[in-house]
Structures are given as structure tokens and as C-alpha cells.
């Protein structure tokens, strides 16, 4: 009957929905959190409350816990003093900082008000050992770390795809030479290669992108070679050869589009790996130079 048919259709749809929900699990929530983090880091100039390298008061403002709010005293000579408490006096200001009281004359302060000072500083996630705001450094550092990871991935994947395709399409001799080179490079520990290149080249994010990109292409080359070797004898490729198309055109028009799925999967995985490598190098003092913020030198 029609009612029974509709029931079976609805049952099939609901069971299919349950299967999708079980397969996905918490993936949508994880993707949402990741997208939120990426968006926050990209919007760092608008979301960060302070300059990530500003050190307002390395004595009273260092290592403050999350949620700490302090009075910010603007000095006439330039710079700031951070205080836990501020009391206005007839001649100026009395502030409590670093566990003791201190008196400032009125001409030494530029942001006096009848009740104290006009400015405050709120450390939402606390401060580091140089009184820098951790939230601002996390946002700016995430933007830099993700940029380094993405650009290094582009270099790494471009080099790996090019060498892997050349090995697969260039004949037996070229394939043997390139694959032995890849295997030789893969026997060297990754961080030894990074450290050696880092010692030879100048400091800076651009150099770090180049180092990470040049040292992470070997696996992509092997994956590309494997995919191209499996595709180049397919019927559609043989038909293209029968039409006297060049090997370059066959690769770009017929082989590469069919090999993209595993290459894109690996490219997405390698971004996280390269971000972790940047963080590890910065933690060891070989990555992004201080005071520039990155996730790695924040850990340091």
C-alpha cells in the first residue's frame, strides 16, 4: 500500500541519517572549532586588544594570571607603569606596584583624572614574562604560524608533485635516479635537515617558509609517482597517446586531475605537520625570531 511504501522510504531515510551521524561523529563540532580559530587568527588586527610585542611594564606586569585588570599610568617621559591600586594625592599620584607603594608627581603623569588615571589594561588570558598580552600574541602568532604552514605546504607539494610526475613519466633511468635521491633524503632525520638549513640561511619568516617547504616534499613525490604510474596505463591515457598528444598535455589534462584526491588529502595533513615543525623550531630558538609572536616561541 501507499502508506507502507511511505513508511519504508522514511525508515530508509532515517536509518541513512543515523549512519551519517555515526560516521561523522563529532567531526562537525571539530570543524567548527577549527574554523573559529582560523577566523579569529585572521582577524587578529581587529580582535587583539593590544600590540603583541608591546612590553608596558616588565616589573609589575609580568606573569599575570588570566583576568587581571591593572591601572595603566602613562609617563610623561614615555612608556607605562602598571599598578594594582592607584590613589590620587594633592601633589600627584600614589600607586601600588610590585608589592610596594610608590609616589609620582603630577608632572610625571599624562593621564591623570580626579580619581586616579584614565587607562586600564585587562589581561584576558594573562601576561608573559615580559608583560606582553598573551591573547594578542596568540592571535597574531596563530596567523603567522598558519601562514608559514600554508605557504610551506604550497612549496613542498609543488616540488613533490613536479619531481614525482617527472620520475613516473620520464623513463626508467630518470625514475631510478630521482627515487634513490628521495630515499637518501628520507634517511636523514627531518629536524637535522631543518637545523642545518636554518644555520646556513638568515633568520626570518620567509627563510623559515623556504626551509620547511624544501625539506618536506619527499613523501609527496612518492605519492605522486605511485598515482601517476597507476594511471598512465589506463585506457583513457592510451587513447590520448593514440591522438598524438604530448606527454605534458596528457599529464596535465588526464593524469593529474585523476590523481588529485590522494594528493589533496596528503596536502591537508602536511599543513598541520608543518605548523608543528615551525612551532618546534621556534621553541628551540631556530624559528621565528623574538619578539615577533608565533605559537612556537610562545611555548618557549
For the regions a protein language model found, what residue spans apply to each?
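Alpha-helical transmembrane segments of integral membrane proteins
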Residues: 127-300
Amino acid at each position: 500500500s501507499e502508506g507502507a511504501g511511505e513508511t519504508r522510504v522514511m525508515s530508509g531515510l532515517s536509518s541513512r541519517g543515523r549512519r551519517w551521524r555515526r560516521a561523522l561523529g563529532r567531526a562537525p563540532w571539530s570543524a567548527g572549532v577549527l574554523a573559529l580559530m582560523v577566523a579569529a587568527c585572521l582577524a587578529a588586527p581587529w580582535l587583539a586588544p593590544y600590540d603583541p610585542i608591546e612590553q608596558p611594564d616588565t616589573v609589575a606586569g609580568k606573569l599575570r594570571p588570566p583576568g587581571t585588570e591593572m591601572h595603566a599610568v602613562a609617563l610623561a617621559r614615555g612608556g607605562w607603569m602598571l599598578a594594582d591600586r592607584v590613589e590620587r594625592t594633592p601633589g600627584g599620584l600614589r600607586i601600588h606596584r610590585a608589592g610596594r607603594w610608590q609616589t609620582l608627581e603630577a608632572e610625571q603623569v599624562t593621564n591623570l583624572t580626579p580619581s586616579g588615571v584614565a587607562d586600564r589594561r585587562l589581561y584576558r588570558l594573562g601576561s608573559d614574562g615580559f608583560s606582553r598580552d598573551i591573547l594578542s600574541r596568540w592571535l597574531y602568532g596563530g596567523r603567522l604560524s598558519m601562514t608559514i604552514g600554508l605557504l610551506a605546504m604550497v612549496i613542498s607539494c609543488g616540488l613533490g608533485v613536479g619531481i614525482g610526475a617527472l620520475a613516473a613519466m620520464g623513463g626508467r633511468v630518470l625514475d631510478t635516479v630521482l627515487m634513490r635521491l628521495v630515499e637518501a633524503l628520507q634517511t636523514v632525520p627531518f629536524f637535522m635537515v631543518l637545523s642545518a638549513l636554518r644555520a646556513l640561511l638568515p633568520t626570518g619568516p620567509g627563510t623559515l617558509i623556504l626551509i620547511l617547504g624544501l625539506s618536506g616534499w619527499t613523501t609527496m613525490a612518492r605519492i605522486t609517482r605511485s598515482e601517476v604510474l597507476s594511471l598512465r596505463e589506463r585506457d583513457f591515457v592510451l587513447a590520448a597517446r593514440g591522438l598524438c598528444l604530448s606527454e605534458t598535455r596528457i599529464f596535465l589534462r588526464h593524469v593529474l586531475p585523476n590523481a588529485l584526491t590522494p594528493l589533496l588529502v596528503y596536502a591537508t595533513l602536511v599543513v598541520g605537520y608543518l605548523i608543528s615543525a615551525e612551532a618546534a623550531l621556534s621553541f628551540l630558538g631556530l624559528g621565528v625570531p623574538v619578539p615577533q609572536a608565533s605559537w612556537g616561541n610562545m611555548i618557549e
